[in-house]
Amino acid sequence: MSSDRQRSDDESPSTSSGSSDADQRDPAAPEPEEQEERKPSATQQKKNTKLSSKTTAKLSTSAKRIQKELAEITLDPPPNCSAGPKGDNIYEWRSTILGPPGSVYEGGVFFLDITFSSDYPFKPPKVTFRTRIYHCNINSQGVICLDILKDNWSPALTISKVLLSICSLLTDCNPADPLVGSIATQYLTNRAEHDRIARQWTKRYAT
């Protein structure tokens, strides 16, 4: 009996020691297999690299084109127009258009925002008026209804040609394709009143 108790006591530390080792093992430590799963696959890495290269190529193409147009418009700006980057961002420009002589906007200075996307010149720039203007093809948010800024855009067009088209729109509006229907109707039915208000707005907001 005494011998059996001693044997039992001798075996207890061994059992306790084994339990202690299990308790000391860090349950949060990932198994080697788990660490393997967390690494991105070679296919995923290749896909990410390809997407990054494609984006960089698009930015490079658009930036080169915009730089080229900036050099051209600086050397030879369209009549009554100027344009260039707002700061260090080549994709964000500010433009100034002087009201065409003989138009109801004569004497006004109109500011516009120009935003190029990374898809330029395959997609048109976004051009909006910052200065308020009374015009049936330009709404109160400065959005311009001009076909070459929408469906009729072509990569062969440049920002200089866009500004020339906007100047032409200031000289001769297009009431057949209005953005502000009430102004278009007034232009067609009461031209004198239309011109009076347009000159009034030019004096109030653009001088």
Curated annotation (Swiss-Prot):
Residues 1-10 have a biased composition (Basic and acidic residues). It catalyses: S-ubiquitinyl-[E1 ubiquitin-activating enzyme]-L-cysteine + [E2 ubiquitin-conjugating enzyme]-L-cysteine = [E1 ubiquitin-activating enzyme]-L-cysteine + S-ubiquitinyl-[E2 ubiquitin-conjugating enzyme]-L-cysteine. Pathway: Protein modification; protein ubiquitination. Ubiquitously expressed at low levels. Highly expressed in skeletal muscle. GO terms for molecular function: ATP binding; ubiquitin conjugating enzyme activity; ubiquitin-protein transferase activity. Pfam families: UQ_con (PF00179). The keyword ATP-binding applies. This is Ubiquitin-conjugating enzyme E2 E3. The gene is UBE2E3.
